[in-house]
Amino acid sequence: MTTLFDILNTLNNNNNNNNYTGCKRQYSINKRVDIIPSMDVTLTNDKLIIETELTGVSKNDIDINIKDSILIIQGEKKKSIIKNQQQQQQQQQLENSNNKENDEPSIEEFEEDVKSKSELNKTTLNTTENKDEDKTTQNINKEFISERSFGNFKRYLNLSEILYQLDLNSIDTQFENGLLTITIKKKFDSSNTIKININ
């Protein structure tokens, strides 16, 4: 009978498991892996519980799948500053696309535009001085201290030894306080022997 320690040994020992190394090689070509999250695996009488630490990761940035008997948890841990900048850029793009639809001015708007251009020419000299001051006071993001890890993360768990015992239709996932919990119930009849009837 396979113990939990056997499963973890198989996972960590690349030389003894061709499926694991093949999977690792195949997926690491596409993206560089910056973070390998910590994982706890518990096998009880009725279920398999996998807990993965993903502090600071949004649940929308996590991808979970099972391929060739290997559970793959992957995604990206983004800096909060970058997230905010991306959201602002998306909002600006939406606003710009909405403004382009309403680009043609009415007669009143055209007359106001002509007046504003003449006023603008008068104030050009004053604004050039203000622009130079604005350049010096612009906010520049500098990292004073950066100790946290960011980037792509990926973690594998080889389930080939116990996959026949698991009911994959019962997979339940929860993500709370930076902890991803995957629960897979065991089948009622988990024997790997199949009875074949003769016709």
Curated annotation (Swiss-Prot):
Positions of region (Disordered): 83-105
CDD domains: ACD_sHsps-like (cd06464)
Pfam family, one: HSP20
Keyword terms: Stress response
Domain sHSP: 30-199
PANTHER family the UniProt entry points to: HEAT SHOCK PROTEIN DDB_G0288861-RELATED (PTHR46827:SF1)
Family label: Belongs to the small heat shock protein (HSP20) family.
Protein's name according to its UniProt entry: Small heat shock protein hspG4
Native organism: Dictyostelium discoideum (Social amoeba)
